[in-house]
Structures are given as structure tokens and as C-alpha cells.
């Protein structure tokens, strides 16, 4: 089995007489299961990663039917990597693959910018950890407060949970929501160490409300304690965005670039994921190298020998091409506990679309959930085995255990973990449930990069198979607009109530001139529930009776 690359193809199994020759699925015949396992197994020798789709109900006839669709998907992916407008709704290129192989970028300026950014991030991380770059008071930085939403929060959280070793780099704290209680808890935990905390704000446009609100709360707390905000603030944003201009004008400690052609859910190999990796002492170049290796393996225009294509085909067949089965992610390692949440965004934001590229209403998508094994075996696996058959499982295992957890009385925790995975996989198969498995010899930055790249490419292929734009998010934008409308309505409601006169929600709506009674009730219930200067009189069980006023 040779090392994979452009001239050496990853091993994909043996015993097949033709390109689509393997036995049809059988839940009861162990020899057929073994034959399918041998025939369908994909293996990357250098990465030490296996993909097994043999327990998915994929038969040769399915792959033959999907071949024309994959021919188009392979061509579309090649065009995307070459710089085509792959996101036509927003007239944008899609370039996250360039981030780990800069020579693919369409021009020298972009290639140089990517390479320079990686060098700067790597050096900045080293300088912060070593104390060369110091906090405003002259002490070394002790912590990082990371402010980001969506992929700008999930990607960094995955990097930290998956790669940070004990005592390695700086401890991380997150503002990844606008929950006041959550912010308060983080700030209370930092307490006096806030003065030696590096505060990183991530916002591509610089105008997203959630990171802006988190940033202002952090700035207020720093400055209220006499700190110098600019000397401990870092921005990750697009050049000349609102946030970038503020950082440049106020002299922030550092700014790193986000690119118009990288979406949040695929930004983990940009500064969004590389900076947290650098700040915990992870090998970010190895992380990028792993992603690049998997990218190379998944460029192969051969359905049977491309792991991302095999995954996408399995998803398609399992859900009849309409997302009729959920994806349950079961990583049997604590370090990958966040991975199911990461995949939730990557898969659901990419594939959950109302319209296809031709404007037809299709309501596509694959729901994703999961936590970790073997914890999940004592939670929802009961339903997976005996309940509604509306899912397929994705098992993820790491073979190599740590050396400091010994075998005691002939019992090894790693053996039990492996046994639990195999047992659950077998029990699901016996119950007619589908699953695929990803196995890794070891887990480190390189394998994490490869794992992420595998799913990124599979999502792209699946999007092409079902003819949807996997690179925009109109539903998210619709939610942002609706939220902005509610906040605008709230400001007008508060203006009406300034005269102090008690009003029902219906009377408030009439005075405002638009909005709905229900929306106004929700607004007023929130305001009255906090110390914001509003009173509510009436029966809460009868919302129409309550009269709200400004005290």
C-alpha cells in the first residue's frame, strides 16, 4: 500500500473484480459483512485513517446510479478549487481549500497573503506563550478570552478541546453567546486575571451583533478596572471592515485577516482556528498538512477510491437523497466531544436549504446530533437500537491509547472502550440500523485536520448531488433580519411607553403602528422581568389583560 498523493492512490480494499463489484448488504450473514468490509474499506497509509461504509445499506446498483452525479460533482469541485464562483447567490469564490495548499489559490497575491498570515500567527502564538509579547502591565499573558459566534466559536472550541495538552499554552474562555449570565460567569472566573487576558474578537464583517456585544462587555470590564483595552485586544476580521478600522485606529495589539472567500463554518484552517491552535502550543502547520493530505486524497475523481465521495454516497442512499435520516455522531474519545457540535453547523448550515439551484422548493438537509461514546450508550443508544429507524450512526475511534493509564488486574479502559464501540455497532446492525466508521491509528493535530477536511469535502459533494448551494446561508440571514426587526420594534415600544401610561399589548401595537400583539408581549415580558424600569399589572395567565407601563 503506497503513500497517497497525486501519483499514488490511497488503498481502498481488495477482492473487487470490477469498479462496483461488492456484495449487497446483509444484516445476518457474517461472511457477506466481512466481504463488504474488505471490498469497501478505504485506508490512507500515511495518515493511518480508515473509512468503512460496509454497514451502510449501499449496494453496487446505488453507486452505478450515482456515478453520473459524481462525475458532475468532481468537475464542480475542481472548478471551485480553481477559483470559480462556487457561491453564485453571493457571487463569491469558495477558497477554504487554498488555506492549507496556498499554491492552489488563483493568484500570487492571495498565495502570498495566506503564507504570510500563517507565519505571523505561528510567531504570535510563540511570542505570547513565551512572554515576549506581554500584557499591558508588563506581565505575561495568563488567559485568552475568545469572542466569536457560530463557526468563529465552534472551530476554536474544537481546536482547544481536541488538541490542548495539560499545561500547554494559555487557558481559553469563551463568549460564544449573548447570554448575560454566561458572560458574567466567564468574567467572574477571570476576575483579577482579566488584566492579563488576551481578548480576541472574531467578526468577518465587523458588524455581527453577537461578537460586538461580547467585545463591548469585555472592553467595559477591562476599562472599568483601569486597564488599557487596546494593549490586550486582538481582532480577526476582513481588511477594512468596521472592526478592522476600529482596531487600526485605536492601536490594538494585533489584527489577523479573514477572507471574503471563506465562510464561518469552513474557517477553522484560517486564522479563526490557527490562532487558538498557536496559543495552546499546537502544531498548526501539522494541522494544515493533515487537511492538505486529505484534500489531496479526496480530489481523486473515482467514486470507489475517494473517501469523501463514499461518505456522500452513503448519506445520499441512507436518506433517499432527501435527508430522511439523521446523522448521529459517536466519537469514542473525550477529545472529540465537541466534534458533533462542529459537524452540526458544517452539515446543517451547508445542506439545510429550502431551494435548489434551479429555484425549486426541495427543503434539503441532514440533521446532526451526538456527544461521545461510551456515554451515549447510556443515553439515547436505546432508541437508536429499538426505536424509530430514522438515522445512521457515524462511529469515530482512535486506536492508540495514552501510556500513563495502565492495565490493572488485566483490565484496560481502552479495551473496554473498543469493546463498547464494536458492541454498539453490532447491535445496531442486528437491529437493521445503518452505520459507518472512521478509525485513526492515533489522534493529533494532523489527524484532526484530515478529519475536518474529509467532512468538508463530503458536504460539498453531497450539495452537488442534490443540486443545492452548500456555501450560502439565507436562513441565517433571514433570522438576523427578523431579530433586527424585533429590536427595532422594541425601541419604538419603549418610546411609546415613556409617557408612563399603562397599556395592554394591543394598545401598544396601535400606538406603535405595526408589530404583532404576541411579539410585543414577548418584548414586554422580557423587559418587565429585568430591572429595566417597567411594570406589569394583571394576570400573567391572561396575556391580553396585562397592562404595561414605564415606572
UniProtKB/Swiss-Prot annotation:
One record GO biological process: gluconeogenesis
Active site (UniProt): 349, 378, 480
Keyword S-adenosyl-L-methionine carried by entry: no
Cell inner membrane in keyword set: no
Gene3D superfamilies associated with the record: Glucose-6-phosphate isomerase like protein, domain 1 (3.40.50.10490)
Principal location: cytoplasm
Protein name: Glucose-6-phosphate isomerase
UniProt organism field: Parasynechococcus marenigrum (strain WH8102)
